[in-house]
Amino acid sequence: MQEANAADQTPFSPVIGVDIGGTQLRTAVLLGGQLRSRVSMITGANPTPERILPRILRAIEQAIDEAHIPRNTLAGIGVAMPGPLDYRTGIIYSPPNLPGWGQVPLRDIFLQHYTLPVYIENDAHTAALGEYMFGSGRGCKNLVYLTISTGIGGGVIIDGKILEGANGTAAELGHMSIDWHGQRCSCGNMGCLEYLASGTAIARMANEAIADGQGAELLAFASTMLAHPTTAPDQAALPAVQEPEALEQDDMDDGEEPLRVNARTVARAA
């Protein structure tokens, strides 16, 4: 596990943050945990390293200029992006939402341009760390963070440390199969949670519904959901995590059985 200790941060040294996502690219300069500048752009089609990395390097330069800080005071660069990746070596291993990123030595690429320490980490893990240090997780020893965006991912902090797992893919629940007879996900598995419930999946299913002549029903459903936002935990869903066996086997088809298994796994880890 990696230590997640806010006390280790040098509060007066500016740092560069980079977020490489399947939908958006972001760079920022932070000083003492406060945002000094930020540059955002759309990832775009065909997001290969050859197309994206030059844009990111230009965005970093823009963020530094807009932050109005001396370059010789920069302490390091932190890069968050979808896994799988090796945070020790900084090598990226074919993220499903970023085609063409197989075996990319991302840390070495950044080191060719900057004489600064460079840290590469799974984006959901960094989000969990941010929540632990600066958000709702402050004061907690343990937390689970779930992200639902272009994909679905998770990060776990246990006793103040990031849970990496054997190969850095701990809490990658987006690519757990919840329907073994479902459609093939971009990762190659069948019926992944990400394929069925991510932001990308919701957009895909909405387009399919519109193409099938269900646009009016979809709009009515969306209006109802917006009129009644969720403001508290769904009490009906809690037994699925607290007591997975409460999901009776007789009430499940083949696609729902993996959900019970995954719920049991989460409950045991909690």
Model regions: which residues?
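Short acidic-glycine loop/turn motifs at beta-strand connectors
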Residues: 31-34, 88, 158-159, 180
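Nucleotide/phosphate-binding catalytic cleft detector across ATP-hydrolyzing
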Residues: 1-15, 116, 136-143, 189, ...
